[in-house]
Structures are given as C-alpha cells and as structure tokens.
Amino acid sequence: MPSVSSDAPLLDPKNDYVFKRLFAQRIDLLTDLVNLVRGGAEPLKLTEILNPHILPEDITGKQIVLDVRALDSRGRSIDVEVQVRAQRDYSARALYYLARSLVDQIGESEAYSKLRSVIGVSILDFQLFREPGEEANGQWRFAMRADQQLDQPDQPPRPPRELEVQLEMNFLELPKLARLGLEKTNKPLYDWC
C-alpha cells in the first residue's frame, strides 16, 4: 500500500464537493462549526442531515440545492452555504433560501403552529458588507426582532423582543476575519477558517 506523504496538499474545504462530503457525513463537525459561526447565540444540537434539495413550488419556479441542510433537536432547519465567488445580491439570495425552507415546512391544510425557525449560515470567501464602519466586522447575525416600541417613543426601551418562529441569517466573511486578528479574539473559529 502506498504511503501518504505529510506534504500532500490538503483539499480546500471551501470547495463545494469537499464541504458537502465533510459536513454531510460528520454532524458533530457541522454542529461545532454552526455554533461557532453563530457566535454567542444559544448553541444548537444538530440531530439529522436532510436532503439539500428544495424543489420549486411549480414547474417554472427556482430549484434550490443547499450545500448542507440539517435539523436540530427543536425541529429547526439549518441551511449552510459556502460561497466563493462574490455576488452583490448574495444577502437577498440567502434570505430567499431561508424563506423557501420556511414555506416548505407545511402543506396547504396544515397549521401554522407547525412552523419552526430556519437558521442560515453563509461562509463567504468575499466581503459582502462594504459600507463605512462595516470593514471592522466579519461575523454577522441577523434576526427578526422588535428593537423599539413605536407607540411609546418617550418611554425607556424594553429589551428586544424576538418572534417565536425566526428567520436567522449568519454571515462569516473570511477575508475580513484574516485581517481582524481572529486568531487572538476567537481561536476556535480561527482554527475552522
């Protein structure tokens, strides 16, 4: 049997094939990565890898093929994507994927109470957020919540209120993280990147 050289090049995990093979077969690694990307959010316990295909609602609709799709212990769908090529409208695409994952959960006569949150994790090899002040952040989490009470603007603010069923989007911009000294501020995430 030929020996494997320690000088052999490693496969790039940003490659779709490598990413899918690695994380679709190792739910423990996927769980660790998703929790690190989500930062301080409540940790997830992923329990099942799902079919990554989301079929169109009709023959003219868009078919979605995610890199990895999983379910957590509370029935929430976790959609994970790696995107190497820059796309200016990527955040709209990511939101569309989450919305379709939400819509896919129930059929025509099923109760809305069956809906569970959908959490998206996008690992980007480009800078998505480029506005002034955004260059110092490479890890983002967006969720639907009420930041203020519009009917009582003169009152002290209440804590933000999140909806029970969420569309949560997490973005990790790899080029920024390399610049921002992630090795010192978040070593476990740095080791993944």
Predicted features by range, described:
Residues M1-C193:
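Elongated, amphipathic alpha-helical interaction scaffolds
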